[in-house]
Each structure stands twice: as structure tokens, then as C-alpha cells.
């Protein structure tokens, strides 16, 4: 429960609360629709996050987490145990709801109570209602406890976040009354209720049999149990012997489940795979394919489960090694030793959150992990042979159980096109296949092309299915985990941070190989001759390839990764026309500066984006409703007046607003602003759709776009350029260097260095607001902020807040940047207090003294196309480069590469 975010309600004015996790309280007001003005979702935050620094931090209070916490605490370590729910135990050991009393608690309830009591006696500190929203380092975790932001800095970190159920994506799985087996079991076991008098249970695994048995014993009619595995026959005797020998009590439970169901007249239909659910007169009808032919079972509720997916997000965010397990839908598992040790010395991962194995394995490995953490911290802890023996027995039992319930791998090709795969964004299997037909060839590009996996559940319900459709078979193929790992109230994280004058940067040559680099599918080496080689197939490279191909040139464009899937689709989609407060000194640089000269290009480029939209047949969500740049003081307002004057000199439609005019136009702003500059031509668009359209148009124009093709060597041979790639040699009459952060590296190979460095920048997205909060793009005149509301209602926050490179060289978020960016946004738009942040991401950007555009006089035939504000300016720069290629004037002289030779 709690993974799909389908049950959102408004509670006491607080929008988008998960009903399945909210306890009913007297006087509570619950509404289905979001309010026009949501109440703040968290208490007023402190100025900075409080810190906790235990010896051992355990995330997750299920069997594994409880066992690890007890072992470490009894060995003398200070232990804090975090769990999102209001009581320890997890799904397997969940307690009975407080509204009920035990008549005769079963073994699971008794075991849960004993573990909780032992943990309390050992001094374990429980923090319930705690969500770890980001893992930035083994000793830096962002944690929300009771709505307050905290930072955990443990000496050892034990991850035991559990698993979520493997969804069954079939037509009708989103209908009311269809739920996961675990959700229905929570209702039945902890709350003693059922969503219907008659229930059908389907899928794969012993949990379905246990639920059916518990429902029968609770007085619920079970219409049938449909098990996807074939009926165990005589040839399963080896597995039966192993089960009985390794865990006779659990084996007996299985026998008892079947006996109870048989006595109740409940049919267990083996080899039955769910196909679809349809509304019926008296509830729902589940259709399935079975060995004896199609089956249809009608009930008031349907429980579906095809296994489990580990919650590996925190471990992946930290950089722990993972493997892909090709079973069922397929899943990522954290690679660990018997004691939960990962590839990171400070991090241990245990339980179903690391590898699916069940409660017995979780308990044994949890104890070994807790002892290992204590031993690392200098505690005298002897080896626990009994736990190692218990682990071996449990692993043997689980392996036999999996063989008994083994089913064929998930075949994504059987999904009907109208099957909803991504519930949050309502993306169908057909939409995913259509995106693949248009060139999306990875999970990442499918996600960007369709928005699958971008909703509140952050891919928990659809990522494995999308990965199957995309053919993702290794850990790097999966979408990178992002902070926050679950939706978090924006207000809770809004904490002021120091701002900066110069962004941190680095040489792009030090960057790692791209996840898609060199995956050319084993293409044979070949030689290609072309008129123009474009190096870099981001938005700028694709725009240039399209423009040059339309001129009749034979164009080949290369990208080290997947075309357009780097910084171009990691940006916020702003269409900037006015001068930026944080990109340059603006008016102080004077009318001859590069920053001022670029003013002539912005409006023209926005118009060209509209032309691209018309040609593509899509609107691309282009909106030009103006852009505000806010001033807090009269001094800042005077500086904006100078900026507006310069912009007008260059033909930009810009004006200065006093406080009264500003608040008349933007009543949603926080009070206290002195005024603003308003540029009528600014706006926004959808960068994901824009990039997809541009890629298609470039190919339609005749450009050859190659992904996963890094340039490994580049030289001049007589009158042509020779580019070496893993797939062969390309000889080109001319070269355009549009490699973004890598452009300096490409230029240096030809003996023509240019001053290009790389920087990591952040973007944040909130959930959709229930109402329109703002129409224009908003910038802050003295702080790092860009803010806008997309067509779907979500807010997009930018402002060049920095990220960093992780140990593997991949860009990632910084906790301080997330908190600081949200603080500035809240100071401008108080309504953000009622919204959750659903994701934050980073992308590489260039850090340059100014746009570097046009022919390089040092190397005939070499052209550079490197700029900030690349999304806005890509179409106009493409036209200017195409003009230069045909011998015309090209980009303004102030952007010439020769202007920067002394800075290289």
C-alpha cells in the first residue's frame, strides 16, 4: 500500500494525501477534489535542517530492519530506526489496527510483538512517520519526520526499505475495486474489513493463497484463486521435500491454506494468467487464460499480485552496485554479501528492499547486517553461526518455493495497445510502442517522449513494464533514481541557502562515458563521406543538421549517447528573451557585449520555434505570455530600468512595472516587491515534445542522425576532416562542433581550443496545482530563480542551482540546492506551500564567457556552435550557421571564436 498514489484525497484542506496511509480521526474533513487554495502541507520549517548522527541508521522497520536494529543496539551501538508507517513491522509483521483486539494472535502477530518489544528494550530509537526523501551520501540523507526536514549523518547505514508489489498491467487494472493482494491483505488482516463480500484473487505466489485463506476465515466469499504457475505434480516432489526439510512450519502453512480453501469450496485454478478486468452488473469480471480454456470470474473486488519489486531507489542513488534479475517483469536487485554488505563500505542493504527473499531470509540477513555494522564500529561482536545457518536454510527454502511457483517470463508484446501502463500519466502500451516507432529506443527516451514514469509514484507501478517494452536488461538501462524518492511537501524543504556569483565548473574531458555511448548494436565498421559532420545531436546539433540538410547538404550528426537525451531534455523549457540576472552583468556590460547582442536573436528564435511546431503538426505547448523579472528594492528596480532601456534599444518589447502595476497583474506574488521588468515576448514550451519533433524533422529533411557514436579521434586530412568512431571512419568537407560541454575537447583535437567548461544545473517539478497559479515566466532580479507553470498545472523551478558529479561521474542533485531553490520559490510564490515536490533532476550545461558561434579561422571548414540559453536560441543559431556554411554573413562578429582565443 502507498505505492500507486491512486487514492489521493484532500484532508483538512491539505491536498493530495494518500487515503490508504491516513488514519481517520474525529472531526477530519475528507474531500475528493483539491481545493482552490490548498493549505500548507507541513509546519513552518526551521531555518536549517536539524541533524541526527547515530552510530547506525536503519531505514525500514520490517523484519529485516527490526532484526538489524536489534543486533546493532544489543552490541552497544546507538541506533535510529526510520519507518514511514505509524508502527513497526512492515507488510509481513504489520500489527492489528488499534480499533481491534486480538482473540488469539497467530504466529506472525506474536513474532511482530516480540521483535518490537526486544528492539525497545535494546534502546532502539523509533522514528515513525519518517520518509527518507534523498540519499546524497552514506552519511547525508534527507529525512522528513513529522513533516519536518532533517539530515541523518550515520556512521553506518542499513537500508531495509522493503518491496512493493509487482503490478499486473492488464486492461481494467485501474478500475475501482481492483487492488493489489498486499493492499487487500492489509485491510483484511490489520483492519478486519474487505472491500467486497465476494473477492477473486489472481496472480502468482503463495501470498495469494494466504490472503484467500484469511478472507475465508474472516467470513468473505472467495470466488476463486487463479494461480499463474502450473499445478504442482509428481515431478515437484524434490521441491516439496526441500520445503518440508528447511522450514516445516512454513510448508505446513501452505498445506493448511489449500485445505482451508478446499473445505470452503474455493477453486484454485492453476496455470491461469489474468488477461483483463471488465465492469459487471454486480462488480467486476476477471478474465483469464487457463489450460482448460478461458475463464471468467465475477466478484465485487479483484486482488492481483505477480510478485514483488525491491525498493532499490536509495541504494541506487548512493551508487551501490546492482544487477538485473530476469524473472517475471524483471527487477533490479542490490548486490550484497550474506551480511548485506554492498559495494560501498558504509552501506548495508537487506531484506526484500535489496533482493526478494521473504521474511526468513530478511530476519537472518538483518541480524548479520546489524552485527557487521557494530563490528565495523569497533564493537566486540562474535560471529553468529546460528544466523548463518538460518540464512542458508531460508535461502534453500525460498529457492525451492520459487521453483514451485515458477511462471514464464513476462511477455510485453502481449499487452494490448489500449492497456494503461503508466497509471499516473495515463500512458498506454500503444503510446509507448508509437514512441519507439518514432525513434525512442531506451527506457529514458521512452520516459521523455511519453512521460511514462514521471508521475507521483515515480515509476514504481510502471518502470518494470516500460523497461520490458524498451528491452532494458542492465542496471544502466533503467531510469536513474532522483530525489525526492517520494513526493515531499515543498514547504518542508524550503530553507534559505547562500547564493553564489560563479557556478562550480569542471573540464568536460573528465566526464565519464555516457550510459548509451558506444552501444551501436554491433554495427559493422564502415566509411562514410558527407558534406557536413555535426558533432553533438542535442537540440542545437539537431537544429543545425535540419537547417543544413534543408540547404541540400549531405549531413551526418553524431551523438555519444542517445540523440537529444542529454542536457537538451533536462532543461526547464523556458523561452528566454530578456537579459538574465545571473547569466551576465546585463546592462553594466554595455550595448556591444555578447549578452546585449544576443537580445537581437531571442525573439527571432521564438518565432522559429513556432515555425517548427507548425511544420511538425504539434503545438509543442509553446506559450509566450511574457516574463517578469522581480525587484525587491528600489535600487534593484533602478537596475532593471537600465536593463529595460537596453532591451528596448535592441527591439525587445520590454517595460518597467511599479509595485501597484505588478500586483494588479500578478496578485499571486508574495508581498514586498518593489516592481518588475516585464518582457512580453518571453514564454515556455515542452522540451520533451520539442526535441522529439526536431529529431523527426531533421531526419525528414535528410539528415542522418547516429546515436551511441562517440568521436574517438578527429583530424584534418588535406581538404577534409577525418573522424574516427567505433563504427568506422567519417570523412567530411566541413565540421560543426555542437558538442556542448564537450565542445572544448573536440576543438582541442583540431588544435583550436575554445574556453568551454561544464557545470551541473538543477530543475525541480511539483505536482499539478488544482488551479492556475501564474501565467508568465517569473525570474528574480537578484536571486537564482526561474519559475513557471506548465499546461498540466505543475510548477517548474530552475535558476541554475548547481548539482555535482557522483563518484561514477554522473550528474546528481545537491540537497542544499533543492532546499535553497525551494526557499527562493516560496519567497516569490507562497502557494507552493500547498504542493508536493515530485522530482528534481540535473543536467550538464556549458559555462562559457559568451556564445562561441561561427567559423574558426584557425582551421578552415571548422565551425563552432556553443551557447548558453541553448534551448531558446537553437533555431536561430541553426539558421546563422547554415547561412555561414553557404558563404553568407553568419553569426554576429562578437560571437566569433577568434574573440575568445586569448581565453582558451
Predicted feature residues:
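Dinucleotide-binding Rossmann-like beta1-alpha1 core, especially the glycine-rich loop
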Residues: 140-142, 150, 574-661, 784
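Helix-loop-beta segment of a Rossmann-like dinucleotide-binding subdomain
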Residues: 94-108, 237-246, 446, 618-629, ...
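FAD-binding core/adjacent interface of flavoenzyme oxidoreductases
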Residues: 13-57, 112-198, 218, 285-296, ...
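Helical element adjacent to the flavin cofactor pocket in flavoenzyme catalytic cores
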Residues: 111-126, 132, 251-268, 676-733
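Active-site lid/adjacent beta-loop-alpha segment flanking the redox-cofactor pocket in flavoenzymes
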Residues: 349, 353, 357, 361, ...
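Glycine-rich FAD pyrophosphate-binding loop
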Residues: 75-92, 223-232, 549-571
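C-terminal catalytic lobe of FAD-dependent flavoproteins
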Residues: 265-326, 344, 398-465, 469-478, ...
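Central helical "cap/lid" subdomain
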Residues: 565, 729-774
Amino acid at each position: 500500500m502507498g505505492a500507486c498514489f491512486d487514492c489521493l484525497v484532500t484532508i483538512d484542506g491539505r491536498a493530495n494525501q494518500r487515503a490508504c496511509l491516513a488514519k481517520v480521526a474525529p472531526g477530519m474533513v475528507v474531500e475528493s477534489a483539491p481545493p482552490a487554495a490548498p493549505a500548507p502541507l507541513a509546519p513552518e520549517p526551521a531555518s536549517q535542517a536539524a541533524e541526527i548522527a547515530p552510530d547506525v541508521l536503519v531505514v525500514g522497520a520490517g523484519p529485516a530492519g527490526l532484526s538489524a536494529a536489534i543486533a546493532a543496539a544489543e552490541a552497544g551501538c546507538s541506533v535510529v530506526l526510520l519507518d514511514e508507517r505509524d508502527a513497526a513491522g512492515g507488510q509481513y509483521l504489520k500489527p492489528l489496527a488499534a480499533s481491534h483486539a486480538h482473540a488469539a494472535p497467530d504466529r506472525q502477530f506474536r513474532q511482530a510483538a516480540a521483535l518490537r518489544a526486544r528492539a525497545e528494550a535494546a534502546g532502539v530509537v523509533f522514528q515513525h512517520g519518517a520518509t527518507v526523501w534523498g540519499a546524497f551520501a552514506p552519511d547525508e540523507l534527507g529525512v522528513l519526520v513529522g513533516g519536518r526536514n532533517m539530515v541523518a549523518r550515520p556512521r553506518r547505514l542499513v537500508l531495509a526499505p522493503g518491496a512493493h508489489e509487482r503490478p499486473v498491467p492488464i486492461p481494467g487494472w485501474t478500475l475501482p475495486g481492483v487492488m493489489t493482494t498486499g493492499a487487500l491483505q492489509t485491510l483484511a488482516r490489520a483492519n478486519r474489513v474487505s472491500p467486497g463480500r465476494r473477492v477473486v484473487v489472481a496472480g502468482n505466489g503463495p501470498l495469494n493463497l494466504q490472503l484467500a485463506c484469511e478472507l475465508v476465515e474472516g467470513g468473505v466469499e472467495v470466488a476463486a484463486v487463479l494461480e499463474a504457475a502450473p499445478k504442482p505434480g509428481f515431478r515437484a516432489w524434490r521441491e516439496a521435500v526441500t520445503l518440508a526439510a528447511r522450514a516445516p512450519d512454513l510448508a505446513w502453512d501452505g498445506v493448511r491454506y489449500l485445505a482451508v480453501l478446499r473445505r470452503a469450496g474455493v477453486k484454485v485454478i492453476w496455470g491461469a494468467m489474468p488477461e483483463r478486468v471488465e465492469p459487471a452488473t454486480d462488480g467486476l469480471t476477471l478474465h483469464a487464460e487457463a489450460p482448460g480454456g478461458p475463464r471468467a470470474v465475477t466478484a465485487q473486488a479483484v486482488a492481483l499480485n505477480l510478485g514483488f519489486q525491491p525498493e532499490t531507489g536509495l541504494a541506487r542513488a548512493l551508487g551501490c552496485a546492482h544487477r538485473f534479475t530476469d524473472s517475471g517483469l524483471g527487477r533490479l536487485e542490490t548486490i550484497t554479501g550474506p551480511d548485506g554488505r554492498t559495494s560501498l563500505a558504509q552501506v548495508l542493504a537487506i531484506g526484500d528492499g535489496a533482493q526478494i527473499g521473504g521474511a526468513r531470509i530478511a530476519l537472518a540477513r538483518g541480524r548479520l547486517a546489524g552485527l557487521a555494522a557494530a563490528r565495523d564500529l569497533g564493537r566486540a561482536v562474535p560471529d553468529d553461526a546460528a544466523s548463518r545457518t538460518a540464512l542458508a536454510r531460508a535461502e534453500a527454502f525460498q529457492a525451492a518455493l520459487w521453483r514451485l511457483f515458477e511462471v514464464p517470463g513476462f511477455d510485453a508484446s502481449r499487452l494490448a495497445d489500449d492497456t494503461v501502463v503508466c497509471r499516473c500519466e495515463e500512458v498506454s502500451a500503444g503510446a509507448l510502442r508509437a514512441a519507439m516507432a518514432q525513434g525512442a529506443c531506451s527506457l529514458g527516451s521512452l520516459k521523455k517522449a511519453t512521460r511514462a514514469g514521471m508521475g507521483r509514484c515515480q515509476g514504481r507501478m510502471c518502470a518494470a513494464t516500460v523497461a520490458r517494452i524498451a528491452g532494458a536488461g542492465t542496471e544502466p538501462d533503467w531510469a536513474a533514481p532522483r530525489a525526492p524518492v517520494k513526493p515531499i511537501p515543498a514547504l518542508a524543504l524550503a530553507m534559505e541557502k547562500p547564493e553564489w556569483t560563479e557556478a562550480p565548473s569542471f573540464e568536460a574531458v573528465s566526464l565519464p562515458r555516457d550510459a548509451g555511448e558506444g552501444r551501436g548494436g554491433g554495427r559493422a565498421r564502415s566509411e562514410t563521406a558527407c558534406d557536413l559532420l555535426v558533432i553533438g545531436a542535442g537540440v542545437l546539433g539537431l537544429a543545425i543538421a535540419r537547417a543544413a540538410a534543408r540547404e541540400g547538404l549531405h549531413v551526418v550528426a553524431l551523438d555519444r549517447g542517445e540523440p537529444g537525451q542529454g542536457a537538451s531534455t533536462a532543461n526547464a523549457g523556458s523561452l528566454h528573451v530578456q537579459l538574465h540576472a545571473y547569466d551576465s552583468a546585463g546592462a553594466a556590460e554595455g550595448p556591444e557585449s555578447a549578452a546585449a547582442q544576443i537580445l537581437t536573436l531571442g525573439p527571432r528564435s521564438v518565432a522559429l520555434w513556432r515555425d517548427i511546431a507548425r511544420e511538425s503538426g504539434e503545438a509543442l505547448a509553446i506559450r509566450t505570455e511574457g516574463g517578469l523579472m522581480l525587484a525587491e528594492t528600489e535600487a534593484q528596480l533602478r537596475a532593471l530600468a537600465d536593463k529595460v532601456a537596453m532591451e528596448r534599444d535592441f527591439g525587445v518589447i520590454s517595460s518597467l512595472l511599479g509595485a501597484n502595476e505588478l500586483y494588479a497583474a500578478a496578485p499571486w506574488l508574495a508581498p514586498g516587491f518593489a516592481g518588475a521588468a516585464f518582457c512580453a515576448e518571453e514564454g515556455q514550451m515542452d522540451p520533451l515534445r520539442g526535441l522529439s519533433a526536431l529529431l523527426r524533422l531533421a531526419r525528414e529533411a535528410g539528415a542522418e542522425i547516429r546515436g551511441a557514436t562517440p568521436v574517438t579521434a578527429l583530424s584534418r586530412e588535406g581538404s577534409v576532416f577525418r573522424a574516427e568512431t567505433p563504427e568506422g571512419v567519417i570523412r567530411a568537407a566541413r565540421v560543426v562542433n555542437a558538442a556542448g560541454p564537450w565542445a572544448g575537447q573536440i576543438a582541442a583535437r583540431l588544435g583550436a581550443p575554445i574556453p568551454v567548461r561544464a557545470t551541473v544545473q538543477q530543475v525541480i517539478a511539483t505536482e499539478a496545482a488544482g488551479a492556475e497559479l501564474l501565467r508568465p515566466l517569473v525570474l528574480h532580479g537578484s536571486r537564482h530563480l526561474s519559475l513557471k507553470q506548465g499546461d498540466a498545472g505543475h510548477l517548474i523551478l530552475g535558476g541554475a542551482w548547481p548539482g555535482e558529479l557522483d563518484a561514477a561521474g554522473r550528474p546528481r542533485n545537491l540537497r542544499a540546492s533543492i532546499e535553497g531553490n525551494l526557499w527562493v520559490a516560496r519567497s516569490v510564490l507562497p502557494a507552493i506551500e500547498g504542493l508536493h515536490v515530485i522530482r528534481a533532476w540535473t543536467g550538464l550545461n556549458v559555462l562559457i564567457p559568451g556564445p562561441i558561434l561561427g567559423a574558426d579561422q584557425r582551421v578552415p571548414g571548422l565551425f563552432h556552435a556553443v551557447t548558453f540559453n541553448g534551448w531558446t536560441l537553437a533555431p536561430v543559431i541553426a539558421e546563422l550557421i547554415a547561412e555561414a556554411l553557404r558563404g553568407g554573413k553568419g553569426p554576429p562578429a562578437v560571437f566569433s571564436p577568434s574573440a575568445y582565443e586569448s581565453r582558451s
